[in-house]
């Protein structure tokens, strides 16, 4: 989680002009399919922050809230349906203050700590290594452990790896057995620090790259467990960080992380999650789409040092970041989640699919009750957010083959003081044009083709023509996510205001799909 200040919050009027075209044309290139969309692109992130863990994922075995061995039953079942592929933990900024030995053994003996990064909350360590890794086993997802480099020692991280993954007669394996777990867990992903340029230690790239080399050396592979080591990478426009790590440490890492938030700035108001105008919406869509330029630029730097693409890029924090909801603790980052957030999810996933030759994982922030979450909870109530519904609708693309497309659609020109000032602050050309349609397509192992479409035009239905080429189809069935207002969201009193519905505004004739795509809608189709 980011704790940096480099960009002013700018909520000033912007000028938007839109081309007159009220239709869009997509050409599908199924014959050029090569890349597999890794399921890890749909990864999640859980930090000890606010009520993400306590009250979100975990309530404890003695809670009156229905639970499975301490895990909230309603949340667990919803995540099981989502088919979470990978879960990152324990942070975020919390990771570099977390000492794993405080979170093992009898809960009554675990020491408490102050969560200094996030509101000064008292952390009782009742959710630790066993609780996290057991949850991953229950969900059927890969664990992604973020190790403490900022305030921890090499020995501490090395022993944690041994504790989790050694099946031998080693000291840490014996300690694990003493704490009730005989067989070692399978742990693939290991992050060596988090945001080391900021909350993880305020380090220079050169210093961190040397630390990475040292810490990663002692994170060993035990038995048949093979670690996938991930260096703490850059924040959005910090090209030098990626350059230095690739120059100095690429042969010792399997991946390098990247963080990018759709946020107006890090000083002052970030804007309301639920109260915004049309200009705010379109500016947000432009900021969201800038992630493509950021990914491309970091990939080009990596290509200079690693043309074989042996080192992956992992976008292990992304999503929207608004002001917290009124009446909530500022450091707990609890925000509502509207149809606007759903579009940030769909547009981002469309972009991610295009770059999976290098981009192998993405973890949205965060899974429950924090930032752009899948789920919100309050006492014994739970609600699924519009973002949850996008992830479920897009689940058909996991492990499918990406099908390239050409897209011709209406374009909005983004001008105004907001973008001009941002460009000066970040010393990088910001996005000046915004397509009104975003799309992606894939073919799964059974040969089924799925197409996802987003119409971000808030007022106009668009007729989308999809040329299928050699693909044979006689009909298409699908789901749509939309609502009466772009600011609509689900509440504990009205949990189903924004939810998917059946969609049949599709005609198929002679290799062409004609889709009537309503204003502010997201659709996923299956060709038949």
Language-model features: locations:
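Non-catalytic accessory regions flanking glycosidase/transglycosidase catalytic cores in CAZymes
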Residues: 20-255, 291-324, 328-528
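Active-site His/acidic residue clusters
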Residues: 261-282, 328
């Amino acid at each position: 989680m980011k704790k940096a200040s480099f960009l002013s919050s700018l909520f000033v009027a912007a000028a938007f002009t839109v081309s007159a075209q009220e239709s869009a044309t997509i050409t599908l290139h199924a014959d050029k399919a090569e890349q597999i969309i890794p399921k890890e692109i749909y990864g999640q992130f859980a930090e000890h922050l606010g009520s993400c863990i306590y009250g979100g994922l975990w309530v404890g075995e003695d809670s009156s809230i229905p639970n499975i061995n301490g895990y909230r039953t309603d949340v667990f079942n919803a995540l099981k349906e989502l088919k979470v592929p990978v879960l990152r933990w324990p942070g975020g900024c919390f990771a570099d203050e977390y000492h794993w030995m405080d979170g093992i053994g009898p809960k009554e003996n675990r020491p408490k700590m102050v969560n200094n990064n996030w509101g000064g909350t008292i952390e009782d360590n009742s959710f630790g290594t066993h609780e996290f890794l057991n949850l991953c086993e229950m969900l059927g997802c890969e664990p992604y452990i973020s190790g403490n480099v900022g305030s921890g020692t090499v020995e501490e991280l090395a022993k944690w790896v041994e504790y989790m993954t050694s099946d031998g007669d080693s000291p840490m394996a014996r300690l694990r057995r003493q704490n009730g777990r005989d067989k070692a867990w399978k742990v693939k992903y290991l992050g060596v620090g988090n945001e080391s340029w900021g909350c993880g230690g305020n380090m220079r790239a050169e210093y961190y790259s040397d630390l990475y080399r040292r810490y990663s050396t002692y994170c060993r592979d035990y038995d048949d467990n093979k670690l996938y080591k991930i260096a703490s990478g850059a924040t959005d426009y910090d090209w030098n960080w990626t350059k230095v790590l690739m120059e100095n440490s690429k042969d010792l890492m399997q991946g390098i992380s990247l963080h990018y938030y759709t946020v107006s700035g890090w000083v002052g108001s970030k804007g309301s999650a639920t109260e915004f105008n049309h200009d705010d919406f379109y500016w947000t869509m432009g900021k969201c789409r800038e992630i493509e330029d950021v990914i491309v630029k970091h990939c080009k730097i990596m290509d200079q040092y690693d043309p074989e693409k042996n080192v992956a890029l992992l976008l292990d924090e992304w999503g929207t970041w608004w002001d917290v909801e009124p009446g909530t603790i500022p450091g707990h980052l609890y925000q509502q989640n509207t149809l606007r957030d759903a579009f940030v999810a769909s547009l981002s996933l469309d972009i991610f699919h295009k770059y999976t030759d290098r981009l192998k994982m993405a973890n949205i922030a965060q899974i429950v009750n924090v930032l752009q979450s899948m789920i919100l909870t309050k006492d014994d109530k739970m609600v699924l957010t519009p973002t949850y519904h996008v992830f479920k609708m897009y689940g058909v693309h996991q492990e499918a083959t990406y099908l390239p497309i050409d897209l011709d659609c209406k374009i909005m020109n983004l001008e105004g003081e907001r973008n001009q000032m941002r460009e000066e602050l970040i010393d990088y050309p910001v996005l000046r044009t915004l397509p009104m349609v975003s799309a992606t397509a894939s073919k799964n192992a059974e040969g089924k083709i799925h197409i996802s479409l987003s119409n971000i035009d808030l007022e106009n239905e668009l007729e989308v023509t999809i040329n299928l080429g050699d693909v044979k189809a006689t009909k298409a069935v699908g789901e749509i996510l939309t609502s009466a207002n772009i600011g609509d969201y689900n509440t504990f009193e009205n949990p189903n205001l924004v939810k998917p519905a059946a969609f049949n505004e599709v005609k198929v004739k002679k290799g062409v799909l004609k889709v009537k795509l309503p204003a502010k809608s997201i659709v996923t189709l299956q060709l038949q």
